[in-house]
A protein has these predicted regions:
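Acidic ATP/Mg2+-coordinating residue in the GHKL
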Residues: 97-98
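Conserved ATP-binding N-box helix of the HATPase_c
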Residues: 56-81
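Short, non-transmembrane amphipathic alpha-helical segments
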Residues: 35-38, 65-69, 73, 103-113
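DHp/HisKA dimerization-phosphotransfer hairpin of two-component histidine kinases
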Residues: 1-47
């Protein structure tokens, strides 16, 4: 299982790298959809929603946020909900999943703050970026 998870993480990162070079409106949403594909291929239901007009997010910040999402998407059992919310000062990306894994660790860098919580079954993680 651990080897499969590691392969899924790298497959999601490759998909994200390919999505980074696409000229798409809303590159973060586009990259998260590419990362979600790996979970969907395992039968995990992934729902990605946006709230508000998302600001431009630098590539290095998008990479950290999508790495956080990949960590959750590759360990989810059956469902993940991703919500991207535009904030006056940046963006918040919230993920809720039935993942048994511990929350991903993130070094405080690039103005990103990571919060998490867990109930019996679900893991909630929010990455908040401030410009």
């Amino acid at each position: 299982p651990e080897m499969r998870r590691a392969c899924a993480v790298e497959a999601a990162r490759l998909r994200r790298l390919m999505a980074e070079s696409d000229d798409a409106p809303g590159p973060l949403v586009h990259e998260l959809h590419a990362c979600a594909d790996v979970a969907e291929r395992r039968g995990v239901a992934v729902d990605i929603e946006t709230v508000g007009a998302l600001p431009a997010v630098p590539a290095d910040v998008r990479r950290v946020i999508s790495d956080t999402a990949i960590a959750i998407l590759t360990t989810a059992v059956s469902q993940v909900r991703v919500t991207l919310t535009a904030l006056p000062e940046g963006i918040a990306v919230s993920l809720v999943a039935d993942s048994p894994a511990p929350p991903p660790r993130l070094a405080a860098a690039l103005g990103i703050v990571l919060e998490h919580d867990r109930d019996c079954r679900n893991l909630w993680v929010e990455a908040r970026w401030t410009r």
